[in-house]
């Protein structure tokens, strides 16, 4: 456990907090982090802008990991967030997830908040939920 930690991010301060905790776990267990930014396929109207945002977020995550001595593997994809997180988790052999409980707007019911709820119900690996 904790060999490959998935950290989904939307670039919010809540996601940053989840990343900080994942980095601490990774340092303790000599783990790598699989950072995921998923462009929800239903938001294709602003695709270019969101893709640029996603790339910037992943660069920031990788830079932070490098500074802390933790290997970060980046994944930016377009699709259904839950389905594609499951695909990435299986392909990369993720064995745990560190995720925030709130979305960008501080809501527990929008975007990552609702996705978090679905992740908890779907995934059968350890999940660290960050408030």
Where in this protein do the model-derived segments appear?
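Conserved hydrophobic residues forming the short capping helix/wall of the S-adenosyl-L-methionine
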Residues: 26, 61-65, 89
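Gly/Ser-rich helix-loop-strand patches that form or flank binding pockets
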Residues: 88, 92-131
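Conserved beta-strand positions in the Rossmann-like core of class I SAM-dependent methyltransferases
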Residues: 34, 73, 128
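Short glycine/serine/threonine/alanine-rich loop segments
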Residues: 31-32, 70, 94, 125
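Short, surface-exposed alpha-helical segments at coil->helix boundaries
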Residues: 19, 48-59
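Short, well-ordered secondary-structure micro-motifs
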Residues: 18, 45-49, 86-87, 109-111
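Structural beta-alpha unit
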Residues: 67-97
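Small/aliphatic-rich secondary-structure junction motif
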Residues: 3-48
């Amino acid at each position: 456990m904790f060999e490959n930690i998935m950290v989904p991010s939307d670039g919010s301060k809540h996601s940053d907090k989840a990343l900080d905790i994942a980095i601490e776990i990774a340092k303790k267990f000599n783990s790598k982090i699989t950072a995921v930014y998923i462009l929800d396929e239903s938001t294709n109207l602003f695709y270019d802008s969101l893709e640029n945002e996603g790339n910037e977020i992943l660069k920031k995550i990788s830079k932070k990991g490098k500074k802390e001595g933790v290997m970060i593997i980046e994944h930016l994809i377009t699709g259904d967030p839950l389905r594609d997180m499951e695909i990435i988790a299986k392909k990369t052999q993720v064995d745990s997830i560190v995720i925030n409980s709130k979305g960008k707007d501080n809501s527990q019911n929008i975007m990552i908040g609702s996705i978090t709820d679905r992740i908890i119900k779907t995934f059968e690996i350890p999940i660290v939920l960050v408030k």
